[in-house]
A protein has these predicted regions:
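Rossmann-like NAD(P) dinucleotide-binding subdomain of oxidoreductase/dehydrogenase enzymes
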Residues: 1-88
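ALDH superfamily catalytic-core signature
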Residues: 15, 58-188
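Residue-level signal for inorganic ion chemistry
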Residues: 26, 49, 114, 164, ...
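Short, contiguous strand/loop micro-motifs
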Residues: 44-46, 148, 201
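Glycine/charged-rich beta-loop-alpha catalytic/anionic-binding loops adjacent to active sites
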Residues: 72-73, 197-199
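Short, well-ordered beta-strand elements within core beta-sheets of diverse protein domains
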Residues: 110-113, 198-206
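Hydrophobic alpha-helical segments and helix-packing faces
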Residues: 157, 194-197
C-alpha cells in the first residue's frame, strides 16, 4: 500500500508541476512513522489536517495544535428511491464496491431501496453481475463476515467473491460474480451486513 501511494503521489506531483504548481506542492512521507506524522501535523506551515487511517491517528491529530478534521469508520449506505435512474445507480454502486475488491472504506456498504423499487433494483443488480444470496447463503456468509469478538474478519478483506465463498464454505457462487448481496433487516452488532465490509459484499435493505 505504501509503495502504491508513493507512486500515485509521484504522478500527481509531476502533473501538478507541469500544470504550473510549485515543485513539491504535492508530496508524501516516504517512510511513515507516528513520529514523522506528528512532526508534520505540528509544523508551522501545516494549515489543516484531514486525519484518517484509524482511531489512533484521529486522536493524535486533535491535540496537535493544528485545525483537524477526523474521519471515522466508513459505513456509507446508498439510497435508491423512486426517482432514481436504476441502471446508473446500480452501475455506480457496483463500480465503487468492486474497485480494489471493496477495500476503500469510502465505498458503499449497503443499499437501501424503496419497496416499490425492489424488483427493478434486484433485476438490475443481477444484470450487472451481482449475486443475490439466498436466505441460507446470507446467514452462512453473515456468520463469516465478523469474528467472534464482533470485528471484521480479515479473511474477507480485499478478496474476490469466489475466494470469500471458498473461505466461508459457500457453494453455488458463479466465478464471474462481482459482488455478493445479502438481504438485511437490522442494524448494529447482530446485523453483519449493516457493518463495514472491506470486501465485495453489500447489504440490501428494503
Amino acid at each position: 500500500a505504501k509503495n502504491c501511494i508513493l507512486r500515485t503521489v509521484h504522478f500527481l506531483a509531476e502533473a501538478a508541476e507541469a500544470a504550473g504548481c510549485p515543485r513539491g506542492a504535492i508530496s508524501a512521507i516516504s517512510t511513515p512513522t507516528m513520529e514523522a506524522t506528528q512532526e508534520l501535523m505540528k509544523h508551522k506551515y501545516t494549515a489543516l489536517i484531514l486525519a484518517t487511517g484509524g482511531g489512533a491517528m484521529v486522536k493524535a491529530a486533535y491535540p496537535s495544535g493544528t485545525p483537524a478534521i477526523g474521519v471515522g469508520a466508513g459505513n456509507g449506505p446508498a439510497f435508491i428511491d423512486k426517482s432514481a435512474n436504476v441502471e446508473q445507480a446500480v452501475k455506480r454502486i457496483l463500480d465503487s464496491k468492486t474497485f480494489d475488491n471493496g477495500t476503500i472504506c469510502a465505498s458503499e456498504q449497503s443499499i437501501i431501496v424503496e419497496q416499490a423499487m425492489e424488483s427493478a433494483v434486484v433485476r438490475e443488480l443481477k444484470r450487472q453481475g451481482a449475486f443475490l444470496l439466498n436466505e441460507a447463503q446470507t446467514k452462512q456468509l453473515g456468520g463469516f463476515i465478523l469474528r467472534a469478538n464482533g470485528t471484521m474478519n480479515p479473511k474477507i478483506v480485499g478478496k474476490s467473491c469466489v475466494r470469500i465463498a471458498e473461505y466461508a464454505g459457500l457453494s453455488g457462487i458463479p466465478a464471474d460474480a462481482r459482488v455478493l448481496v445479502g438481504r438485511e433487516t437490522g442494524v448494529g452488532e447482530g446485523a453483519p451486513y449493516s457493518r463495514e465490509k472491506l470486501a465485495p459484499i453489500l447489504g440490501l435493505f428494503v
